[in-house]
Amino acid sequence: MSDAALRPDLALIARNVVAGARVLDVGCGEGILMAALRDAAGADVRGLEIDPAKVSAAVGRGLAVVQGDADTDLAYYPDDSFDYAILSQTLQTTRRPDKVVQSLLRIGRQAFVSFPNFAHWRGRFSLLFGGRMPVTRLLPDLWYDTPNIHHVTIDDFRAMVRDHGWTIDGQWFLNGGRETGSTNANLFAEHAVFLLRG
């Protein structure tokens, strides 16, 4: 699968996973990233997904995916069992994002975490001038019908990383699906991808 067929954050992650790596994709959906990593990088991929229909779709692609919840089921994975643990656009749906990231860093040597940036200027504009929760391309659901229970910003995420003593090995910011600079990323980036180490 080419980068063009992947969501921009997934394409960025795929380009940065080393060939032959052992990878756990948490919140893997239908396994789009897993299939790309398996086919293009020869990665040994596993997945954890809460939605049974998406688990079935991923298994139908020949992928090793189990149904489970990131908030509770990561405890069953042994320490250092993967080179990378990936959490893409799932952080904001977890009950305790800090505990989930801590589990990822226990399970994997490094963790990729991507999320929509709630502090992007369009969201701020919507709140400031419209007085309403933003609905954007990356946050498409109305406030009362969304899986998102935490709205994270780039600066908040960096603060969480700092507070827990984790290390940022890489950070990328996306706007309109394209990489953008880190200057004022909290204001101008729609999406963030971090590579962390415990």
Where are these regions (language model features)?
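Conserved alpha-helix/loop element of class I SAM-dependent methyltransferases that forms part
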Residues: 4-20
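Alpha-helix C-terminal capping/helix-to-coil transition sites in glycosyltransferase folds
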Residues: 19, 80-81, 107
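Class I SAM-dependent methyltransferase "Motif I" SAM/SAH-binding loop
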Residues: 27-29
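Class I SAM-dependent methyltransferase SAM/SAH-binding core
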Residues: 32, 36-73
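Short conserved loop adjoining the S-adenosyl-L-methionine
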Residues: 73-79
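A short SAM/SAH-binding and catalytic strip from SAM-dependent methyltransferases
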Residues: 84-96
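S-adenosyl-L-methionine-dependent methyltransferase catalytic module, highlighting the catalytic core
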Residues: 98-103, 110-198
